[in-house]
Amino acid sequence: MRPLDVTPTISPGAQDLPRTMHFAAEPPLQPLIIDITEEEKLEITYIGKKLKRKYKSYDDPGFISMLHLNAYTLLPERIAKVLSNFGTDFSDQQYGAVVLRGLIEIGQDELGPTPRSWQETDHEKIMEYGFISSLLHGAVPSKPVEYFAQRKGGGLMHAIIPDENMSFTQTGSGSRTDLFVHTEDAFLHNAADFLSFLFLRNEERVPSTLYSIRSHGRPDAILQELFKPIYKCPKDANYASEEALGDDIRTSVLYGSRSAPFMRFDAAEQIYNEDANQDPEALHNLKRFWEEARKLIYNDFVPESGDLIFVNNHLCAHGRNAFLAGFREENGQLVKCERRLMLRMMSKTSLINIREVTHPENPYLIMEEHYGKVYSAHLANL
């Protein structure tokens, strides 16, 4: 990993980033980290509780239909401006991730013990955090969505919890192996535009890993090869092996601007999964790319309770280090602790552009299965 000197931050009270400011020529190597003030934290915490009392659930149609207005009306102005700028900045200096450090006060006693798996989540206990996450996406502006390919929808927000039965998998439920960096749902044409990861607990002190395509600078000859539509990507480890392979479709890893491209990439599935059966040229190109990319992975940020990472899924891949769930190290000794608990939300900037792959009765439920192939609508119990 390239040595880092100073973590970029916006100090408390600073306003939005001016569009005309001049950036250094060096490519960005780490996310912007914004320290939330105590006043902002109290305001956001209050907003979450207030919206829960009014709407009961963050997927209430009345709340979702007013999401963007609520975001600009209710969020602290500084945070709304940062996210609004973030949503339209695809420049060569945009890393593609923003950390909102100390965003919200998490009531640990009210939260109770971490469930054994996401299936046992008590959604009532995390409801107010769903409202807050939704508002942040609304400020981009972007609309929260759910994917049938993940938990058969499962709602607009997913609890990410280490599951002992899946501890060695390349999924959010894993823990005992490094989760390789990946853009979310790289096997879909209509993957999320933006992601948020709200950490309710990270007592094991697990670093989050981020990797931005912008960290390479202007694409060299190795990266230019990734514009070729020759790369396969199976579905992830949530699927049985035969089902995961899907159709034999090839796409590019990089797309969009040749000088400042977007990325669709999953290291685990495209490089380390032998069942992907990449063509020799494709695998050669991916391995050369990975040798460069892995040196640019940023994992110096250890989230604490109440921190949130906001990600542009077209620019920045995410993952995490391996850890032993329910234990942290203190003075060389393993000490028992509550297991990690994180909340993920995904969003799209346009429901119109994805309408052919969304459920006929629910434009927020994306039914894409694998690179344009769509699940039958009758599978979803609405």
From Swiss-Prot:
Parts forming coiled coils: none
Catalytic activity field: L-lysine + 2-oxoglutarate + O2 = (4R)-4-hydroxy-L-lysine + succinate + CO2
EC nos: 1.14.11.-
Record organism: Chitinophaga pinensis (strain ATCC 43595 / DSM 2588 / LMG 13176 / NBRC 15968 / NCIMB 11800 / UQM 2034)
InterPro entries reported in the protein's UniProt record: TauD-like_sf
Residue sites binding Fe cation per the record: H182, E184, H318
Task performed by this protein: Alpha-ketoglutarate-dependent dioxygenase that in vitro catalyzes the regio- and stereoselective hydroxylation of L-lysine, leading to (4R)-4-hydroxy-L-lysine. Cannot use D-lysine or L-ornithine as substrate.
Biotechnology comment: Being totally regio- and stereoselective, this enzyme is of interest for biocatalytic purposes to produce chiral scaffolds that are of synthetic value in the preparation of more complex functionalized chiral molecules such as natural products and analogs.
Names of the cofactor(s): Fe(2+)
Family assignment from sequence similarity: Belongs to the clavaminate synthase family.
UniProt entry keywords in alphabetical sequence: Dioxygenase, Iron, Metal-binding, Oxidoreductase
Protein name per the record: L-lysine 4-hydroxylase
Species lineage: Bacteria, Pseudomonadati, Bacteroidota, Chitinophagia, Chitinophagales
